[in-house]
Amino acid sequence: MSNKKTFKKYSRVAGLLTVALIIGNLVTANAESNKQNTASTETTTTNEQPKPESSELTIEKAGQKMDDMLNSNDMIKLAPKEMPLESAEKEEKKSEDKKKSEEDHTEEINDKIYSLNYNELEVLAKNGETIENFVPKEGVKKADKFIVIERKKKNINTTPVDISIIDSVTDRTYPAALQLANKGFTENKPDAVVTKRNPQKIHIDLPGMGDKATVEVNDPTYANVSTAIDNLVNQWHDNYSGGNTLPARTQYTESMVYSKSQIEAALNVNSKILDGTLGIDFKSISKGEKKVMIAAYKQIFYTVSANLPNNPADVFDKSVTFKDLQRKGVSNEAPPLFVSNVAYGRTVFVKLETSSKSNDVEAAFSAALKGTDVKTNGKYSDILENSSFTAVVLGGDAAEHNKVVTKDFDVIRNVIKDNATFSRKNPAYPISYTSVFLKNNKIAGVNNRTEYVETTSTEYTSGKINLSHQGAYVAQYEILWDEINYDDKGKEVITKRRWDNNWYSKTSPFSTVIPLGANSRNIRIMARECTGLAWEWWRKVIDERDVKLSKEINVNISGSTLSPYGSITYK
Protein backbone atom coordinates (compact mmCIF):
# COMPACT_ATOMS: atom_id res chain seq x y z
CA MET A 1 0.00 0.00 0.00
CA SER A 2 2.86 2.32 0.91
CA ASN A 3 4.49 1.55 -2.45
CA LYS A 4 1.31 2.54 -4.24
CA LYS A 5 1.17 5.85 -2.35
CA THR A 6 4.82 6.50 -3.13
CA PHE A 7 4.22 5.80 -6.82
CA LYS A 8 1.22 8.16 -6.83
CA LYS A 9 3.25 10.86 -5.12
CA TYR A 10 6.07 10.69 -7.66
CA SER A 11 3.57 10.61 -10.51
CA ARG A 12 2.04 13.83 -9.19
CA VAL A 13 5.49 15.41 -8.91
CA ALA A 14 6.26 14.51 -12.52
CA GLY A 15 2.95 15.94 -13.63
CA LEU A 16 3.45 19.14 -11.65
CA LEU A 17 6.90 19.62 -13.11
CA THR A 18 5.38 19.39 -16.57
CA VAL A 19 2.73 21.97 -15.62
CA ALA A 20 5.42 24.21 -14.17
CA LEU A 21 7.35 24.03 -17.41
CA ILE A 22 4.28 25.08 -19.38
CA ILE A 23 3.58 27.95 -16.95
CA GLY A 24 7.18 29.08 -17.19
CA ASN A 25 6.81 29.39 -20.94
CA LEU A 26 3.62 31.40 -20.46
CA VAL A 27 5.29 33.70 -17.92
CA THR A 28 8.16 34.35 -20.29
CA ALA A 29 5.74 35.22 -23.04
CA ASN A 30 3.78 37.55 -20.71
CA ALA A 31 6.94 39.21 -19.52
CA GLU A 32 7.91 40.06 -23.07
CA SER A 33 4.46 41.46 -23.67
CA ASN A 34 4.54 43.51 -20.45
CA LYS A 35 7.90 44.95 -21.35
CA GLN A 36 6.54 46.35 -24.57
CA ASN A 37 3.62 48.04 -22.73
CA THR A 38 5.65 49.40 -19.76
CA ALA A 39 5.79 53.00 -20.93
CA SER A 40 2.08 53.43 -21.46
CA THR A 41 1.27 51.67 -18.22
CA GLU A 42 3.49 53.95 -16.17
CA THR A 43 1.85 57.07 -17.66
CA THR A 44 -1.70 56.07 -16.89
CA THR A 45 -1.15 54.65 -13.40
CA THR A 46 1.15 57.15 -11.64
CA ASN A 47 -1.48 58.23 -9.09
CA GLU A 48 -3.05 54.77 -8.70
CA GLN A 49 -2.23 51.95 -6.29
CA PRO A 50 -0.24 49.22 -8.15
CA LYS A 51 -2.20 45.99 -8.95
CA PRO A 52 -0.65 42.53 -9.03
CA GLU A 53 0.50 41.40 -12.51
CA SER A 54 -1.50 38.73 -14.26
CA SER A 55 1.58 36.46 -14.34
CA GLU A 56 1.89 36.67 -10.59
CA LEU A 57 -1.76 35.70 -10.23
CA THR A 58 -1.19 32.75 -12.55
CA ILE A 59 1.83 31.53 -10.57
CA GLU A 60 -0.09 31.92 -7.32
CA LYS A 61 -3.00 29.90 -8.69
CA ALA A 62 -0.68 27.29 -10.12
CA GLY A 63 1.13 26.93 -6.81
CA GLN A 64 -2.16 26.45 -5.00
CA LYS A 65 -3.22 23.84 -7.61
CA MET A 66 0.05 22.00 -7.18
CA ASP A 67 -0.47 21.81 -3.41
CA ASP A 68 -3.98 20.45 -3.96
CA MET A 69 -2.64 17.81 -6.37
CA LEU A 70 0.11 16.73 -3.99
CA ASN A 71 -2.45 16.22 -1.22
CA SER A 72 -4.84 14.33 -3.56
CA ASN A 73 -5.07 10.53 -4.01
CA ASP A 74 -6.03 10.84 -7.72
CA MET A 75 -3.59 9.47 -10.35
CA ILE A 76 -2.06 11.88 -12.84
CA LYS A 77 -2.26 10.39 -16.33
CA LEU A 78 0.38 11.40 -18.83
CA ALA A 79 -0.18 10.71 -22.54
CA PRO A 80 3.27 10.22 -24.11
CA LYS A 81 3.74 11.24 -27.73
CA GLU A 82 3.63 8.13 -29.90
CA MET A 83 6.04 7.56 -32.83
CA PRO A 84 4.78 5.44 -35.78
CA LEU A 85 6.12 1.87 -35.32
CA GLU A 86 6.61 1.33 -39.08
CA SER A 87 8.79 4.39 -39.39
CA ALA A 88 10.93 3.28 -36.47
CA GLU A 89 11.46 -0.16 -37.98
CA LYS A 90 12.49 1.36 -41.30
CA GLU A 91 15.01 3.58 -39.59
CA GLU A 92 16.36 0.62 -37.64
CA LYS A 93 16.66 -1.55 -40.79
CA LYS A 94 18.32 1.28 -42.68
CA SER A 95 20.82 1.61 -39.91
CA GLU A 96 21.48 -2.14 -39.87
CA ASP A 97 21.92 -2.27 -43.66
CA LYS A 98 24.36 0.60 -43.55
CA LYS A 99 26.29 -1.10 -40.79
CA LYS A 100 26.30 -4.38 -42.71
CA SER A 101 27.53 -2.73 -45.92
CA GLU A 102 30.39 -1.20 -44.01
CA GLU A 103 31.41 -4.56 -42.51
CA ASP A 104 34.17 -6.50 -44.28
CA HIS A 105 33.43 -10.24 -44.61
CA THR A 106 36.39 -11.00 -46.86
CA GLU A 107 38.21 -13.14 -44.31
CA GLU A 108 35.06 -15.06 -43.45
CA ILE A 109 34.32 -15.83 -47.12
CA ASN A 110 37.87 -17.06 -47.73
CA ASP A 111 37.88 -19.24 -44.61
CA LYS A 112 34.49 -20.80 -45.32
CA ILE A 113 35.13 -21.53 -49.01
CA TYR A 114 38.61 -22.88 -48.34
CA SER A 115 37.12 -25.18 -45.70
CA LEU A 116 34.48 -26.66 -48.05
CA ASN A 117 35.01 -30.42 -48.18
CA TYR A 118 34.21 -32.15 -51.49
CA ASN A 119 35.64 -34.41 -54.19
CA GLU A 120 35.83 -32.68 -57.59
CA LEU A 121 35.13 -35.88 -59.53
CA GLU A 122 32.20 -36.91 -57.35
CA VAL A 123 30.30 -33.61 -57.29
CA LEU A 124 30.52 -33.43 -61.08
CA ALA A 125 29.91 -37.12 -61.77
CA LYS A 126 27.30 -37.82 -64.42
CA ASN A 127 26.12 -41.39 -64.42
CA GLY A 128 24.27 -42.22 -67.59
CA GLU A 129 22.52 -45.42 -68.51
CA THR A 130 23.12 -48.74 -66.79
CA ILE A 131 22.62 -51.69 -69.12
CA GLU A 132 21.40 -54.90 -67.56
CA ASN A 133 19.32 -56.87 -70.03
CA PHE A 134 19.63 -56.87 -73.80
CA VAL A 135 19.42 -59.40 -76.61
CA PRO A 136 23.00 -59.96 -77.84
CA LYS A 137 22.05 -61.25 -81.29
CA GLU A 138 18.99 -61.23 -83.46
CA GLY A 139 18.31 -62.60 -86.92
CA VAL A 140 15.84 -61.00 -89.28
CA LYS A 141 14.83 -62.61 -92.59
CA LYS A 142 13.71 -60.31 -95.39
CA ALA A 143 13.13 -61.85 -98.82
CA ASP A 144 16.55 -63.12 -99.95
CA LYS A 145 18.30 -61.32 -97.09
CA PHE A 146 19.25 -62.39 -93.59
CA ILE A 147 20.21 -59.54 -91.25
CA VAL A 148 22.18 -60.33 -88.14
CA ILE A 149 21.85 -57.62 -85.49
CA GLU A 150 24.61 -57.90 -82.92
CA ARG A 151 24.63 -55.97 -79.68
CA LYS A 152 27.57 -55.57 -77.33
CA LYS A 153 27.70 -53.84 -73.98
CA LYS A 154 30.25 -51.02 -73.91
CA ASN A 155 31.41 -48.39 -71.43
CA ILE A 156 32.47 -44.82 -72.02
CA ASN A 157 34.16 -42.52 -69.52
CA THR A 158 35.07 -38.96 -70.51
CA THR A 159 35.96 -35.79 -68.61
CA PRO A 160 35.56 -32.88 -71.02
CA VAL A 161 36.56 -29.43 -69.76
CA ASP A 162 34.93 -27.35 -72.48
CA ILE A 163 31.16 -27.51 -72.25
CA SER A 164 28.89 -26.73 -75.17
CA ILE A 165 26.69 -23.66 -74.77
CA ILE A 166 23.06 -23.66 -75.79
CA ASP A 167 20.78 -20.63 -76.06
CA SER A 168 18.93 -21.32 -72.83
CA VAL A 169 22.04 -21.02 -70.63
CA THR A 170 23.96 -18.08 -72.13
CA ASP A 171 22.94 -15.83 -69.23
CA ARG A 172 24.73 -18.11 -66.75
CA THR A 173 27.74 -19.18 -68.82
CA TYR A 174 29.36 -15.83 -69.57
CA PRO A 175 32.95 -14.92 -68.54
CA ALA A 176 33.20 -14.43 -64.73
CA ALA A 177 29.76 -15.92 -64.05
CA LEU A 178 29.35 -17.81 -60.77
CA GLN A 179 27.76 -21.26 -60.80
CA LEU A 180 27.10 -24.26 -58.59
CA ALA A 181 28.89 -27.57 -59.13
CA ASN A 182 25.82 -29.76 -58.97
CA LYS A 183 23.64 -32.03 -61.11
CA GLY A 184 22.39 -29.07 -63.13
CA PHE A 185 25.96 -28.29 -64.19
CA THR A 186 26.56 -31.87 -65.37
CA GLU A 187 23.38 -31.72 -67.46
CA ASN A 188 24.39 -28.41 -69.07
CA LYS A 189 21.73 -26.55 -67.10
CA PRO A 190 23.93 -24.71 -64.57
CA ASP A 191 22.50 -22.88 -61.56
CA ALA A 192 23.77 -19.31 -61.28
CA VAL A 193 24.95 -17.71 -58.02
CA VAL A 194 23.75 -14.10 -58.17
CA THR A 195 25.09 -11.72 -55.51
CA LYS A 196 26.95 -8.42 -55.09
CA ARG A 197 30.28 -8.58 -56.92
CA ASN A 198 33.61 -6.83 -57.03
CA PRO A 199 34.76 -5.34 -60.35
CA GLN A 200 36.12 -7.97 -62.75
CA LYS A 201 38.75 -7.78 -65.51
CA ILE A 202 38.13 -9.64 -68.77
CA HIS A 203 40.47 -10.16 -71.73
CA ILE A 204 39.74 -10.89 -75.41
CA ASP A 205 42.40 -12.62 -77.52
CA LEU A 206 41.79 -10.77 -80.80
CA PRO A 207 45.15 -9.88 -82.41
CA GLY A 208 46.67 -6.41 -82.38
CA MET A 209 44.75 -4.91 -79.46
CA GLY A 210 47.52 -5.05 -76.86
CA ASP A 211 46.49 -3.46 -73.53
CA LYS A 212 43.17 -2.41 -75.05
CA ALA A 213 42.14 -6.08 -75.07
CA THR A 214 41.63 -5.99 -71.29
CA VAL A 215 38.83 -4.04 -69.61
CA GLU A 216 37.35 -3.90 -66.14
CA VAL A 217 33.62 -4.44 -65.64
CA ASN A 218 32.41 -2.69 -62.48
CA ASP A 219 29.38 -4.90 -61.92
CA PRO A 220 29.98 -8.19 -63.80
CA THR A 221 26.39 -9.16 -64.59
CA TYR A 222 25.47 -10.93 -67.83
CA ALA A 223 24.26 -7.68 -69.39
CA ASN A 224 27.32 -5.67 -68.37
CA VAL A 225 29.85 -8.32 -69.43
CA SER A 226 28.06 -8.84 -72.76
CA THR A 227 28.13 -5.10 -73.41
CA ALA A 228 31.84 -4.95 -72.58
CA ILE A 229 32.58 -7.82 -74.99
CA ASP A 230 30.55 -6.18 -77.76
CA ASN A 231 32.52 -2.96 -77.23
CA LEU A 232 35.82 -4.84 -77.46
CA VAL A 233 34.75 -6.61 -80.67
CA ASN A 234 33.59 -3.35 -82.27
CA GLN A 235 36.82 -1.68 -81.20
CA TRP A 236 38.78 -4.45 -82.94
CA HIS A 237 36.75 -4.13 -86.13
CA ASP A 238 37.15 -0.32 -86.14
CA ASN A 239 40.80 0.01 -85.19
CA TYR A 240 42.74 -3.26 -85.31
CA SER A 241 41.31 -5.61 -87.93
CA GLY A 242 42.76 -3.66 -90.83
CA GLY A 243 39.68 -4.62 -92.77
CA ASN A 244 40.83 -8.24 -92.76
CA THR A 245 38.89 -11.33 -91.73
CA LEU A 246 40.09 -13.70 -89.03
CA PRO A 247 40.33 -17.44 -89.86
CA ALA A 248 38.74 -19.76 -87.32
CA ARG A 249 40.55 -22.28 -85.14
CA THR A 250 38.74 -25.55 -85.82
CA GLN A 251 38.19 -28.42 -83.39
CA TYR A 252 36.75 -31.61 -84.84
CA THR A 253 35.20 -34.70 -83.23
CA GLU A 254 33.20 -37.58 -84.67
CA SER A 255 31.38 -40.60 -83.30
CA MET A 256 29.01 -43.32 -84.37
CA VAL A 257 25.66 -43.04 -82.60
CA TYR A 258 24.41 -45.90 -80.43
CA SER A 259 22.41 -44.23 -77.65
CA LYS A 260 21.59 -40.79 -76.23
CA SER A 261 23.91 -41.04 -73.24
CA GLN A 262 26.73 -42.43 -75.39
CA ILE A 263 26.64 -39.60 -77.94
CA GLU A 264 26.39 -37.01 -75.14
CA ALA A 265 29.55 -38.38 -73.55
CA ALA A 266 31.38 -38.82 -76.86
CA LEU A 267 30.72 -35.32 -78.24
CA ASN A 268 30.08 -33.47 -74.95
CA VAL A 269 26.77 -32.08 -76.13
CA ASN A 270 23.20 -32.46 -74.97
CA SER A 271 21.51 -35.18 -77.04
CA LYS A 272 18.27 -33.14 -77.02
CA ILE A 273 20.04 -30.45 -79.03
CA LEU A 274 21.26 -32.99 -81.57
CA ASP A 275 17.92 -34.74 -81.71
CA GLY A 276 16.05 -31.46 -82.08
CA THR A 277 18.30 -30.04 -84.81
CA LEU A 278 19.44 -33.15 -86.69
CA GLY A 279 16.53 -35.50 -86.03
CA ILE A 280 18.36 -38.62 -84.85
CA ASP A 281 16.24 -41.78 -85.01
CA PHE A 282 17.56 -43.57 -81.92
CA LYS A 283 14.88 -46.26 -82.17
CA SER A 284 15.93 -47.32 -85.66
CA ILE A 285 19.57 -47.29 -84.58
CA SER A 286 18.88 -49.63 -81.65
CA LYS A 287 17.03 -51.98 -84.00
CA GLY A 288 19.98 -52.03 -86.38
CA GLU A 289 17.90 -50.55 -89.19
CA LYS A 290 20.08 -47.45 -89.54
CA LYS A 291 23.67 -46.47 -88.93
CA VAL A 292 24.41 -42.87 -87.98
CA MET A 293 27.58 -40.88 -87.43
CA ILE A 294 27.69 -37.37 -85.97
CA ALA A 295 30.57 -34.98 -86.54
CA ALA A 296 30.97 -31.72 -84.63
CA TYR A 297 33.08 -28.88 -86.00
CA LYS A 298 33.84 -26.09 -83.52
CA GLN A 299 35.18 -23.07 -85.35
CA ILE A 300 36.53 -20.64 -82.74
CA PHE A 301 36.97 -16.98 -83.73
CA TYR A 302 38.09 -15.65 -80.34
CA THR A 303 38.09 -16.44 -76.62
CA VAL A 304 37.18 -14.14 -73.73
CA SER A 305 38.86 -14.93 -70.41
CA ALA A 306 38.16 -13.63 -66.92
CA ASN A 307 41.10 -12.98 -64.61
CA LEU A 308 41.25 -15.79 -62.07
CA PRO A 309 40.95 -14.66 -58.44
CA ASN A 310 43.86 -15.10 -56.02
CA ASN A 311 41.37 -15.83 -53.25
CA PRO A 312 37.69 -16.80 -53.39
CA ALA A 313 36.55 -13.56 -51.75
CA ASP A 314 38.16 -11.48 -54.51
CA VAL A 315 35.06 -11.90 -56.67
CA PHE A 316 32.58 -10.80 -53.99
CA ASP A 317 31.69 -7.41 -52.57
CA LYS A 318 33.01 -7.15 -49.00
CA SER A 319 29.45 -6.96 -47.64
CA VAL A 320 28.59 -10.48 -48.89
CA THR A 321 28.52 -13.05 -46.10
CA PHE A 322 28.90 -16.80 -46.34
CA LYS A 323 25.30 -17.10 -45.15
CA ASP A 324 24.31 -15.12 -48.24
CA LEU A 325 26.09 -17.72 -50.38
CA GLN A 326 24.51 -20.58 -48.48
CA ARG A 327 21.10 -19.11 -49.22
CA LYS A 328 22.09 -19.20 -52.90
CA GLY A 329 22.87 -22.93 -52.65
CA VAL A 330 26.61 -23.06 -51.87
CA SER A 331 27.52 -26.13 -49.80
CA ASN A 332 29.87 -29.13 -49.68
CA GLU A 333 27.53 -30.86 -52.13
CA ALA A 334 27.39 -27.83 -54.44
CA PRO A 335 30.63 -25.81 -54.21
CA PRO A 336 30.92 -22.55 -56.18
CA LEU A 337 32.37 -22.41 -59.70
CA PHE A 338 33.79 -19.50 -61.70
CA VAL A 339 33.52 -19.31 -65.52
CA SER A 340 37.13 -18.72 -66.54
CA ASN A 341 36.70 -18.44 -70.31
CA VAL A 342 34.18 -18.62 -73.13
CA ALA A 343 34.93 -19.51 -76.76
CA TYR A 344 33.05 -17.59 -79.46
CA GLY A 345 32.58 -18.74 -83.03
CA ARG A 346 30.23 -21.20 -84.68
CA THR A 347 29.45 -24.91 -84.46
CA VAL A 348 28.59 -27.14 -87.40
CA PHE A 349 26.91 -30.47 -86.66
CA VAL A 350 26.89 -33.03 -89.47
CA LYS A 351 24.80 -36.19 -89.51
CA LEU A 352 25.68 -39.04 -91.84
CA GLU A 353 22.97 -41.68 -92.07
CA THR A 354 22.61 -44.90 -94.03
CA SER A 355 20.59 -48.09 -94.05
CA SER A 356 23.61 -50.02 -95.31
CA LYS A 357 24.48 -53.09 -93.26
CA SER A 358 28.10 -53.04 -94.35
CA ASN A 359 30.80 -53.29 -91.73
CA ASP A 360 32.66 -50.53 -93.57
CA VAL A 361 30.11 -47.78 -92.84
CA GLU A 362 32.14 -46.08 -90.11
CA ALA A 363 35.32 -46.16 -92.20
CA ALA A 364 33.47 -44.77 -95.24
CA PHE A 365 31.93 -41.92 -93.21
CA SER A 366 35.27 -41.04 -91.60
CA ALA A 367 36.96 -40.97 -95.00
CA ALA A 368 34.28 -38.61 -96.34
CA LEU A 369 34.59 -36.26 -93.36
CA LYS A 370 38.38 -36.13 -93.69
CA GLY A 371 38.12 -35.19 -97.36
CA THR A 372 39.43 -38.47 -98.74
CA ASP A 373 38.47 -39.24 -102.34
CA VAL A 374 36.16 -42.22 -101.81
CA LYS A 375 35.22 -42.60 -105.47
CA THR A 376 38.23 -44.85 -106.03
CA ASN A 377 37.07 -47.17 -103.26
CA GLY A 378 34.11 -49.16 -104.53
CA LYS A 379 32.85 -50.24 -101.09
CA TYR A 380 32.98 -46.72 -99.64
CA SER A 381 31.45 -45.21 -102.75
CA ASP A 382 28.51 -47.64 -102.63
CA ILE A 383 27.85 -46.80 -98.97
CA LEU A 384 27.92 -43.03 -99.52
CA GLU A 385 25.68 -43.29 -102.56
CA ASN A 386 23.08 -44.90 -100.32
CA SER A 387 23.42 -42.36 -97.51
CA SER A 388 21.89 -39.01 -96.62
CA PHE A 389 23.62 -36.05 -94.97
CA THR A 390 22.37 -33.24 -92.76
CA ALA A 391 24.28 -30.16 -91.59
CA VAL A 392 23.15 -27.62 -88.98
CA VAL A 393 25.06 -24.40 -88.28
CA LEU A 394 24.85 -22.63 -84.91
CA GLY A 395 26.35 -19.14 -84.87
CA GLY A 396 27.97 -17.01 -87.52
CA ASP A 397 25.85 -16.11 -90.51
CA ALA A 398 23.64 -19.11 -89.76
CA ALA A 399 20.84 -17.75 -91.93
CA GLU A 400 22.75 -18.85 -95.01
CA HIS A 401 23.19 -22.45 -93.90
CA ASN A 402 20.76 -22.91 -91.06
CA LYS A 403 19.95 -26.51 -92.02
CA VAL A 404 20.99 -28.40 -95.12
CA VAL A 405 19.79 -31.88 -96.09
CA THR A 406 21.38 -33.49 -99.13
CA LYS A 407 22.51 -36.72 -100.78
CA ASP A 408 25.69 -35.06 -102.03
CA PHE A 409 28.43 -34.83 -99.43
CA ASP A 410 30.23 -32.12 -101.42
CA VAL A 411 27.39 -29.79 -100.40
CA ILE A 412 28.19 -30.53 -96.74
CA ARG A 413 31.87 -29.79 -97.33
CA ASN A 414 30.91 -26.37 -98.68
CA VAL A 415 28.77 -25.66 -95.61
CA ILE A 416 31.76 -26.40 -93.38
CA LYS A 417 34.08 -24.19 -95.46
CA ASP A 418 31.69 -21.28 -96.01
CA ASN A 419 31.66 -18.52 -93.37
CA ALA A 420 34.59 -20.02 -91.52
CA THR A 421 36.12 -16.55 -91.07
CA PHE A 422 35.22 -13.85 -88.55
CA SER A 423 33.86 -10.55 -89.85
CA ARG A 424 31.07 -8.07 -89.15
CA LYS A 425 28.81 -10.02 -91.50
CA ASN A 426 29.76 -13.32 -89.90
CA PRO A 427 29.64 -12.62 -86.14
CA ALA A 428 30.75 -14.98 -83.40
CA TYR A 429 28.44 -16.92 -81.14
CA PRO A 430 29.22 -18.37 -77.68
CA ILE A 431 29.87 -22.06 -78.36
CA SER A 432 31.65 -23.46 -75.30
CA TYR A 433 32.93 -22.46 -71.87
CA THR A 434 35.27 -23.65 -69.13
CA SER A 435 34.67 -23.29 -65.40
CA VAL A 436 36.99 -23.64 -62.42
CA PHE A 437 36.37 -24.35 -58.76
CA LEU A 438 36.42 -21.05 -56.86
CA LYS A 439 38.23 -22.73 -53.97
CA ASN A 440 41.43 -23.54 -55.86
CA ASN A 441 40.96 -22.61 -59.56
CA LYS A 442 41.03 -26.28 -60.59
CA ILE A 443 39.27 -26.94 -63.89
CA ALA A 444 35.77 -28.33 -63.44
CA GLY A 445 35.37 -31.27 -65.81
CA VAL A 446 32.15 -33.26 -65.95
CA ASN A 447 32.98 -36.90 -65.27
CA ASN A 448 30.77 -38.74 -67.75
CA ARG A 449 30.28 -42.42 -67.05
CA THR A 450 27.76 -44.41 -69.01
CA GLU A 451 27.06 -47.84 -70.39
CA TYR A 452 25.58 -48.31 -73.81
CA VAL A 453 24.81 -51.04 -76.30
CA GLU A 454 26.83 -50.91 -79.48
CA THR A 455 24.55 -52.19 -82.23
CA THR A 456 25.96 -53.48 -85.48
CA SER A 457 24.06 -55.15 -88.26
CA THR A 458 25.42 -57.39 -90.98
CA GLU A 459 23.37 -58.27 -94.01
CA TYR A 460 23.78 -61.56 -95.83
CA THR A 461 22.33 -62.41 -99.24
CA SER A 462 21.22 -65.86 -100.29
CA GLY A 463 23.41 -67.76 -102.74
CA LYS A 464 23.78 -71.01 -104.60
CA ILE A 465 26.29 -73.71 -105.44
CA ASN A 466 26.72 -74.58 -109.14
CA LEU A 467 28.14 -78.12 -109.49
CA SER A 468 29.76 -79.05 -112.82
CA HIS A 469 31.36 -82.48 -113.50
CA GLN A 470 33.31 -82.76 -116.78
CA GLY A 471 35.89 -85.40 -115.71
CA ALA A 472 36.56 -88.82 -117.25
CA TYR A 473 35.65 -90.64 -114.07
CA VAL A 474 32.88 -91.42 -111.62
CA ALA A 475 32.52 -88.68 -108.99
CA GLN A 476 30.84 -88.32 -105.62
CA TYR A 477 30.06 -85.16 -103.62
CA GLU A 478 29.52 -84.23 -100.00
CA ILE A 479 27.94 -80.79 -99.52
CA LEU A 480 27.31 -79.67 -95.91
CA TRP A 481 26.34 -76.37 -94.29
CA ASP A 482 24.75 -74.85 -91.19
CA GLU A 483 21.72 -72.59 -91.03
CA ILE A 484 21.93 -70.01 -88.24
CA ASN A 485 19.04 -68.53 -86.29
CA TYR A 486 18.66 -66.92 -82.85
CA ASP A 487 16.13 -67.55 -80.10
CA ASP A 488 14.36 -64.82 -78.11
CA LYS A 489 17.31 -64.63 -75.71
CA GLY A 490 19.80 -64.07 -78.49
CA LYS A 491 21.28 -67.55 -78.30
CA GLU A 492 22.51 -69.00 -81.56
CA VAL A 493 20.49 -71.92 -82.91
CA ILE A 494 22.29 -74.07 -85.50
CA THR A 495 20.49 -76.40 -87.88
CA LYS A 496 22.66 -78.87 -89.82
CA ARG A 497 21.91 -79.11 -93.54
CA ARG A 498 23.16 -81.49 -96.27
CA TRP A 499 22.64 -82.05 -99.99
CA ASP A 500 20.25 -84.90 -100.66
CA ASN A 501 22.60 -86.47 -103.28
CA ASN A 502 25.64 -86.70 -101.03
CA TRP A 503 27.73 -89.83 -101.80
CA TYR A 504 25.73 -90.65 -104.91
CA SER A 505 27.94 -91.57 -107.88
CA LYS A 506 27.77 -89.10 -110.76
CA THR A 507 29.12 -89.67 -114.25
CA SER A 508 30.22 -86.96 -116.63
CA PRO A 509 28.70 -84.73 -117.77
CA PHE A 510 26.77 -83.68 -114.71
CA SER A 511 25.57 -80.33 -113.38
CA THR A 512 23.11 -79.11 -110.78
CA VAL A 513 22.30 -76.11 -108.60
CA ILE A 514 22.06 -76.25 -104.79
CA PRO A 515 20.29 -73.18 -103.28
CA LEU A 516 21.65 -71.72 -100.05
CA GLY A 517 19.65 -69.55 -97.67
CA ALA A 518 20.99 -66.16 -96.58
CA ASN A 519 21.60 -67.58 -93.10
CA SER A 520 23.89 -70.35 -94.37
CA ARG A 521 27.30 -70.66 -92.74
CA ASN A 522 30.18 -73.09 -92.37
CA ILE A 523 29.84 -74.41 -95.91
CA ARG A 524 31.90 -77.54 -96.71
CA ILE A 525 32.38 -78.83 -100.26
CA MET A 526 34.08 -82.15 -100.97
CA ALA A 527 34.36 -83.93 -104.36
CA ARG A 528 36.17 -87.20 -105.04
CA GLU A 529 36.79 -89.37 -108.09
CA CYS A 530 37.11 -93.14 -108.52
CA THR A 531 40.64 -93.98 -109.71
CA GLY A 532 40.14 -97.71 -110.27
CA LEU A 533 43.33 -98.34 -108.31
CA ALA A 534 43.06 -101.02 -105.65
CA TRP A 535 45.29 -99.16 -103.23
CA GLU A 536 43.57 -95.80 -103.73
CA TRP A 537 40.07 -96.43 -104.92
CA TRP A 538 38.85 -92.87 -104.15
CA ARG A 539 40.89 -89.70 -104.51
CA LYS A 540 39.77 -86.25 -103.31
CA VAL A 541 39.64 -83.63 -106.00
CA ILE A 542 38.24 -80.80 -103.82
CA ASP A 543 37.98 -80.54 -100.03
CA GLU A 544 37.13 -77.05 -98.77
CA ARG A 545 35.76 -76.66 -95.24
CA ASP A 546 35.23 -72.88 -94.96
CA VAL A 547 33.59 -71.81 -98.17
CA LYS A 548 32.16 -68.30 -97.92
CA LEU A 549 28.55 -67.66 -98.84
CA SER A 550 28.33 -65.87 -102.17
CA LYS A 551 25.75 -65.12 -104.78
CA GLU A 552 27.21 -67.93 -106.91
CA ILE A 553 29.72 -70.59 -105.84
CA ASN A 554 30.99 -72.41 -108.91
CA VAL A 555 32.43 -75.89 -108.25
CA ASN A 556 34.10 -77.47 -111.30
CA ILE A 557 35.83 -80.86 -111.58
CA SER A 558 37.48 -82.25 -114.71
CA GLY A 559 40.50 -84.26 -115.93
CA SER A 560 41.17 -87.99 -115.90
CA THR A 561 41.23 -90.68 -113.23
CA LEU A 562 44.96 -90.32 -112.72
CA SER A 563 45.05 -86.56 -113.29
CA PRO A 564 41.89 -85.00 -111.89
CA TYR A 565 41.40 -81.23 -111.55
CA GLY A 566 39.04 -79.21 -109.35
CA SER A 567 38.35 -75.52 -108.60
CA ILE A 568 35.97 -73.24 -106.66
CA THR A 569 35.28 -69.74 -107.92
CA TYR A 570 32.92 -67.05 -106.70
CA LYS A 571 30.69 -64.67 -108.57
From Swiss-Prot:
Q: Which GO terms describe its molecular function?
A: cholesterol binding; toxin activity
Q: Where is this motif: Cholesterol binding?
A: 561
Q: What subunit structure does UniProt give? A: Homooligomeric pore complex of 35 to 50 subunits; when inserted in the host membrane.
| Disulphide linkage map | none
State any GO BP term from the record. Answer: killing of cells of another organism
Membrane in keyword set: yes
Protein name per the record: Streptolysin O
Can you supply one Gene Ontology CC term for this chain's record? Answer: host cell plasma membrane
Annotated Low complexity bias: 37-48
Task: Give the region (Disordered) as residue ranges.
Answer: 32-56, 81-108
What Pfam families is this protein classified in?
Answer: Thiol_cytolys_C, Thiol_cytolysin
Q: How does it sit in the membrane?
A: Multi-pass membrane protein
Q: Look up and give the organism this protein is from.
A: Streptococcus pyogenes serotype M6 (strain ATCC BAA-946 / MGAS10394)
Tell me the leader sequence span: 1-33
> Which compartments does it reside in?
Secreted; Host cell membrane
Q: Where's the motif Conserved undecapeptide?
A: 529-539
Q: Which UniProt keywords apply?
A: Cytolysis, Hemolysis, Host cell membrane, Host membrane, Lipid-binding, Membrane, Secreted, Signal, Toxin, Transmembrane, Transmembrane beta strand, Virulence
Top-rank taxon? Bacteria
Chain ranges passing through the membrane: 260-273, 280-289, 358-367, 375-387
